[in-house]
UniProtKB/Swiss-Prot annotation:
Its cofactor is Mg(2+); Ca(2+). Keywords: ATP-binding, Cytoplasm, Kinase, Lipid biosynthesis, Lipid metabolism, Magnesium, Metal-binding, Nucleotide-binding, Phospholipid biosynthesis, Phospholipid metabolism, Transferase. GO terms for cellular component: cytoplasm; plasma membrane. It is found in: Cytoplasm. HAMAP family: YegS (MF_01377). Residues 1-134 form the DAGKc domain. Pfam families: DAGK_cat, YegS_C. InterPro entries: ATP-NAD_kinase_N, Diacylglycerol/lipid_kinase, Diacylglycerol_kinase_cat_dom, Lip_kinase_YegS, Lipid_Phosphate_FormReg, NAD/diacylglycerol_kinase_sf, YegS/DAGK_C. One of its GO terms (molecular function) is magnesium ion binding. Probably phosphorylates lipids; the in vivo substrate is unknown. GO terms for biological process: phospholipid biosynthetic process. Mg(2+) binds at L219, D222, L224. This is Probable lipid kinase YegS-like.
Length: 309
């Protein structure tokens, strides 16, 4: 039997990670044919995934944060064919927030993460397909809008490197009193809501932006999109809620949130609305978000909270 062939797609910011380097060497000694490619600019992940598919690679491993995972997952989803015909997907979490990995209970240590990929059979997982003004996009974890999106977009890269997830909280605190509500209309099967909101979560996964659990019960294998809308509130209440949302305080969110679970959702806004798609901002007045069931196969822990079984 031929050895398993993996392709690791490594975020260029993590090339000095010695733990990953040693883990790759260990997996090679165990008989896995493992190649590494490093991303430096836009389009690299797409190209490397295309090469992996053409080379008949069995597993593509995203080594980086939520953005790297999303890039690699999107690149796989762009290819024709079902999940069984594409390489399986693995994740070595090397980002600042690692929101998907945290919610999925994936190990952070590179050797443990790679060992899990080797030992666990890949499971079918959903992806979100987002159609907007500038063409279709794919999202592996959470699309968010409003207050949390501005915090993620505005958080300084240097601050993230020094302080990790705490950087998002500091940025959120600095925005208190500047929460501008957004007006939009939401519609999906047996769901409709229209009004002004300050935060929005559209979840395949559960959390984004450094620990904001906007969709705390979302599953990545149920074929459904979890929707959380936080309506506009009076100034002081909104500021307090903003702090609690950034800090992951679910009780405050549950008191005011509008929730739904649908296979697809349309959003129409009179003003440009920015959604953060796993770290990548996309602005449009009209979005259609669809949960595409079992689009990929992914290696996940046996007791993964994101799987419904």
């Amino acid at each position: 039997m031929a050895p398993s062939h993996w392709r690791v797609i490594l975020n260029g910011k993590s090339t000095d990670n010695m733990d990953l380097r040693e883990a790759v060497g260990t997996l090679r000694k165990r008989g896995i044919q493992l190649d590494v490619r490093v991303t430096w600019e836009d389009g690299d992940a797409e190209r490397y995934v295309g090469e992996a598919v053409a080379d008949g690679v069995h597993t593509v491993v995203a080594a980086g944060g939520d953005g790297t995972l999303s890039e690699v997952a999107a690149a796989l989803a762009h290819h024709e064919g079902d999940a069984a015909s594409l390489p399986s997907l693995g994740l070595v979490p090397l980002g600042t927030a690692n929101d998907f990995a945290t919610a999925a209970n994936l190990p952070i240590a590179p050797l443990e993460a790679l060992t899990l990929i080797a030992e666990r059979v890949a499971q079918p997982v959903d992806l979100l397909r987002i159609d907007a003004d500038h063409g279709p996009h794919w999202c592996a974890n959470v699309a968010s809008g409003g207050f949390g999106t501005q915090v993620t977009v505005e958080t300084d890269e240097g601050l993230k490197k020094m302080l990790g997830g705490l950087a998002y909280l500091i940025t959120g605190m600095s925005r208190l009193g500047r929460i501008d509500p957004i007006s939009a209309r939401f519609s999906g099967p047996e769901f409709s809501w229209e009004g002004e909101f300050i935060a929005l979560g559209l979840g395949n996964g559960r959390q984004a932006g450094g620990g904001q659990a906007l969709c705390p019960e979302a599953l990545i294998d149920d074929g459904l999109l979890d929707v959380t809308i936080v309506p506009d509130l009076d100034g002081e209440v909104a500021a307090t809620l903003g702090t609690l949302v950034i800090g992951g305080k679910q009780a405050a969110l549950e008191r005011v949130a509008v929730r739904a679970r649908v296979p697809w959702l349309e959003i129409v806004s009179q003003q440009p609305l920015t959604l953060n798609l796993d770290g990548e901002p996309e602005t449009s007045r009209h979005f259609r978000i669809e949960c595409v069931p079992a689009r990929l196969r992914m290696h996940l822990p046996g007791e993964c909270p994101l799987l419904g079984g």
